[in-house]
């Protein structure tokens, strides 16, 4: 089943994540760069882990450039950088 990125629940959650991040990209912030965030990324991909789709701990505010770095070309699947972030983000039910 495809995740519905157009539903009201997702739009509210996405907005809350962006507001909490101050509309700043959390990837580039690590390097001292203040870049506007306009995307919310599922650290644990929703296609593989739908049980984590609505979890705040699984969401990060990113710029388009940073979001593209998290995925392989074409947008499906995580890049090595995306996999590194996923490995560092341990779900509460796996601790």
What is each residue range found by the language model?
Residues 1-20, 74-76, 81-95:
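Nuclease and nuclease-like effector domains acting on nucleic acids or nucleotide cofactors
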Residues 8, 13, 21, 46-49, ...:
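Surface-exposed loop/turn and secondary-structure junction residues enriched for glycine/proline
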Residues 9-39, 63:
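Short cysteine-rich loop/turn motifs with clustered Cys
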Residues 15, 41-42, 67, 71:
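Histidine (H) residue identity feature
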Residues 29-61:
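Histidine-centered nuclease catalytic patch
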Residues 32-33, 59-84:
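Short Cys/His-centered divalent metal-binding micro-motifs
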Residues 54-65, 88-95:
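Short Fe-S-cluster ligation motifs
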């Amino acid at each position: 089943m495809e995740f519905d990125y157009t539903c009201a629940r997702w739009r509210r959650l996405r907005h809350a994540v962006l507001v909490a991040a101050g509309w700043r990209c959390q990837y580039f912030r690590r390097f001292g760069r203040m870049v506007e965030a306009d995307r919310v990324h599922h650290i644990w991909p929703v296609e593989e882990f739908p049980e984590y789709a609505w979890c705040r701990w699984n969401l990060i505010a990113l710029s388009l450039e940073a979001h593209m770095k998290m995925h392989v070309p074409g947008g499906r699947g995580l890049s090595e950088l995306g996999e590194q972030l996923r490995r560092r983000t341990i779900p509460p039910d796996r601790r």
